[in-house]
């Protein structure tokens, strides 16, 4: 093979390996700006966050949506305002339904206050109506969505107590609720149709992922045709068993067994963590707790996602790299952001140009 041909081949191979979805969660942006925060590029020039993200290689932004939050933060209007900025910047949008008035995660999946009295069938209909309405609002505002997650980290279920796994009809109810959400998206006015994601935590635990999908799919109320993506959260600072090796095995197994795209919906790495509450996984010990370490971590995670068979590993999302007022991002580490407290971007954000 002649050198130009070899170089062309190598370039093509590299291009093919790039992730289709290289993203960050930027949900907190409007709150931060209201508090007076500004963002600066590497030269120290103030720019809109979306401009800095785009120039750093980010192509998709993730946004959480809550049903009726008491302060209106993360509600539908908030998300439309934020999404308009993403669209103007040429960024794709991944909308993350929490189906709650506040945070929904493995520790809590609280049914919205206005829905609390609904029995199962009425709740299933409410999820359909709400989801379809949200899709219609995005469509009427001329905003397309690339990904929609029907629930956030729903490993224990969603919309408790009706959709709580491990309780009576829990699995069948979870399946019915998710089926309803999926059908609402497919039957909504939004066009083109977004990819539908189911998102669980602990992406490194293959046995948990398999148990969840096998349990819910076995009810017959939800089928593989109802979703396109399996999203996972994968953090290094909550469990020493969360090794890169375990993560790589888990996502590979997921794609092989279920045939869906696999996406890391959330991840972080700290640049400062003097007193972690949990030991970091053994095979991450060579990655420094630093800005350079953030780059190494993202490359290691992306490498395992792109290695998933059949090109099924399609995305990695860094959770809230610009939330200056919440630098620990819920962990025991002091700084997980990719921006300094002065709003200046750290060099680590540019890793999105190389994954």
What annotation goes with each model-predicted range?
Residues 1-18:
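Fungal secretory targeting signals
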Residues 19-92, 98-127, 231, 237:
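N-terminal substrate-binding region of glycoside hydrolase catalytic domains
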Residues 24, 53, 96, 148, ...:
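Conserved, mostly hydrophobic/aromatic
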Residues 26-29, 66-68, 98-100, 150-155, ...:
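Active-site beta-loop-alpha junctions enriched in small/polar residues
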Residues 34-40, 44-45, 253, 272-355:
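Aromatic-rich peripheral "rim/lid" segments of glycoside hydrolase catalytic domains that contact
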Residues 36-54, 79, 127-137, 206-220, ...:
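Short, acidic/polar
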Residues 49-50, 187, 193-195, 210-283, ...:
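Glycoside hydrolase catalytic-domain groove-lining segments
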Residues 76-77, 105-217, 225, 240-249, ...:
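Active-site cleft segment of glycoside hydrolase catalytic domains centered on the general acid/base Glu
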